[in-house]
Structure formats: structure tokens, C-alpha cells
Swiss-Prot record:
<comment type="similarity">
    <text>Belongs to the archaeal Rpo3/eukaryotic RPB3 RNA polymerase subunit family.</text>
</comment>
<dbReference type="GO" id="GO:0000428">
    <property type="term" value="C:DNA-directed RNA polymerase complex"/>
</dbReference>
<comment type="function">
    <text>DNA-dependent RNA polymerase (RNAP) catalyzes the transcription of DNA into RNA using the four ribonucleoside triphosphates as substrates.</text>
</comment>
<keyword id="KW-0808">Transferase</keyword>
<keyword id="KW-0804">Transcription</keyword>
<dbReference type="InterPro" id="IPR036643">
    <property type="entry name" value="RNApol_insert_sf"/>
</dbReference>
<dbReference type="InterPro" id="IPR022842">
    <property type="entry name" value="RNAP_Rpo3/Rpb3/RPAC1"/>
</dbReference>
<dbReference type="GO" id="GO:0046983">
    <property type="term" value="F:protein dimerization activity"/>
</dbReference>
<dbReference type="InterPro" id="IPR036603">
    <property type="entry name" value="RBP11-like"/>
</dbReference>
<dbReference type="InterPro" id="IPR011263">
    <property type="entry name" value="DNA-dir_RNA_pol_RpoA/D/Rpb3"/>
</dbReference>
<keyword id="KW-0240">DNA-directed RNA polymerase</keyword>
<dbReference type="Pfam" id="PF01193">
    <property type="entry name" value="RNA_pol_L"/>
</dbReference>
<comment type="subunit">
    <text>Part of the RNA polymerase complex.</text>
</comment>
<protein>
    <recommendedName>
        <fullName>DNA-directed RNA polymerase subunit Rpo3</fullName>
        <ecNumber>2.7.7.6</ecNumber>
    </recommendedName>
</protein>
<dbReference type="InterPro" id="IPR050518">
    <property type="entry name" value="Rpo3/RPB3_RNA_Pol_subunit"/>
</dbReference>
<dbReference type="InterPro" id="IPR011262">
    <property type="entry name" value="DNA-dir_RNA_pol_insert"/>
</dbReference>
<keyword id="KW-0548">Nucleotidyltransferase</keyword>
Length: 262
């Protein structure tokens, strides 16, 4: 039975030791976190006025990369948005930007005004464009729910893992020789398997480096759209649905083959 032990956790970061799982399962979770978690991101911009030096296309591109808070519990499932089972307006949020510079001014992400208080820029101090006196920007931006497999602006988090290293130091001098690579040679959270193997090249037979095939150090870091716990729960929901859909399709195909044979 797979087991996870949390080593470090903050609202936006989690590190855990996973035991008793196949690499394929751990990697599947990693891939879902990276490319399939749904988040809100600006996808369409209507520019009413832009007298700044920045092209409309570049301005829209910058707005698209501004991370937005995403209250998953208050939004439809991403699958319903993608298949049209819900009204598109339920998966879309409008944001406004109207700035008339009375003096030199930098426009920040925090200047975007959302029609929903729970969908706003995660970080208010992202610079978008600089205006000089007399210049203005008026636009409407429409954010929608999407996934990173379509575009990186919808990426919610990063995730990775490595095999849990088993390190045995036969010569204490190795710790000093490898301190620039691993400050704590025998600490699996400080010294990853790859770093330990680099030390093995330095120390030779004085250092034994092995790994546990079914034990991993796994970490997740959220970009702030939602916390890391929400990211993991959503990743497991999506992965579970993939398994369920696969079994359903396989059962239907198997049933049709039996009927054809009869």
C-alpha cells in the first residue's frame, strides 16, 4: 500500500516521501499537476484605447501571463467547460483596465479590476507597461478556465520527484570534498540522488550510493492560483477520472466485441 510522509509544507509548497508506489504512478501525478490542473487566465482582450508605446499584441500577451486566483470550489469542473455542458459564461470572468496617466506612471497587475472578487491577480506588483503623461489604456480582458497542456499561462504548479538515495560514507573526508555539491551528504532532502552520484565520481569507492526503487522524494510548488493542498486534491480527482473513463471505455469496447462475435 503506497504511503506518503509530509516532510515540509507551506501554503504554496509541499515536500513528501512516497513509499510503496510504482514510478509510473508517481510520474502520472507529476504530469497531471504540471499540465492538467485548471486555472483562470486571461485569454481574450478587447483593447478600446492604447496610446502607450507597447503594441496591442504585446500588451495582451503580458496580461495573459498574469496569474489569477482560481476558486475551484466556486467554478464548474474543467471537463464541463471543455465539453460545453455548462454555459461558457460560468467559465469566464471579465476584468477591466482603465488608466489615464496624469504623470509618468507604471501600470501594475493590481490595476486590473475584476467583476468577481475571488478571481483577481495573485500578485499585485507585476509591471505591465509604463505610461507617460497624457497616455492612456482602456481595455476589457476575459479570463477563462484552461489547462497548461494548451498554453503555459494556465499552468498552476510545478512538480518533480527523485529516487530516495541511500548513501553510505566509508571515508569522512568525502563530506569535506563534496561540501560544494552537498552540504549534508547523508541528508536525502539536501543531497539528491544525482548530486550524490556526482560526489561518487569524486570520492570513488569511499562512497556508496544506491537508491530505493519504490521510494521517492516528491515536491510540489504552486504558482499561487490556489494552495498546494487544493492542487493535489484536484490532481487526484483528474487522475481518478482518467482511470474511470478508461475502464468505462474498455468495458464498452469489450462488450461490443463480444456482441459482434456472437
Amino acid at each position: 500500500m503506497p504511503k506518503a510522509t509530509i516532510v515540509e509544507k507551506t501554503p504554496l509548497f509541499l515536500k513528501a516521501v512516497i513509499e510503496g508506489a510504482y514510478p509510473s504512478l508517481v510520474n502520472s501525478i507529476r504530469r497531471v499537476i504540471i499540465s492538467e490542473l485548471p486555472v483562470m487566465a486571461i485569454d481574450y482582450v478587447v483593447i478600446v484605447s492604447n496610446t502607450s508605446v507597447m503594441y496591442d499584441e504585446m500588451l495582451a500577451h503580458r496580461l495573459g501571463l498574469v496569474p489569477l486566483t482560481t476558486p475551484l470550489q466556486a467554478l464548474p469542473p474543467i471537463e464541463d467547460c471543455e465539453t460545453g455542458l455548462v454555459d461558457p459564461s460560468e467559465c469566464t470572468v471579465r476584468l477591466m483596465l482603465q488608466i489615464n496617466a496624469e504623470s509618468d506612471k507604471i501600470v501594475y497587475s493590481g490595476d486590473l479590476v475584476s467583476e468577481r472578487p475571488d478571481v483577481v491577480p495573485v500578485y499585485k506588483d507585476i509591471p505591465i507597461v509604463k505610461l507617460v503623461k497624457g497616455q492612456s489604456i482602456i481595455l476589457e480582458a476575459y479570463a477563462k478556465l484552461g489547462r497548461a497542456k494548451e498554453h503555459a499561462k494556465w499552468q498552476a504548479a510545478l512538480a518533480s520527484y527523485y529516487y530516495y538515495p541511500r548513501i553510505k560514507v566509508l571515508d569522512e573526508k568525502c563530506k569535506e570534498e563534496c561540501k560544494d555539491i552537498c552540504k549534508e551528504l547523508t541528508n536525502p532532502f539536501e543531497c539528491t540522488f544525482n548530486k550524490a552520484w556526482t560526489c561518487r565520481d569524486i570520492c570513488g569507492d569511499r562512497l556508496i550510493v544506491e537508491w530505493d526503487r519504490y521510494k521517492y522524494v516528491f515536491w510540489v510548488e504552486s504558482f499561487g492560483n490556489y494552495d498546494v493542498e487544493t492542487a493535489l486534491r484536484e490532481a487526484f480527482r483528474i487522475l481518478k477520472k482518467k482511470f474511470s473513463d478508461f475502464i468505462t471505455t474498455l468495458t464498452q469496447k469489450a462488450g461490443s466485441l463480444v456482441e459482434t462475435k456472437v
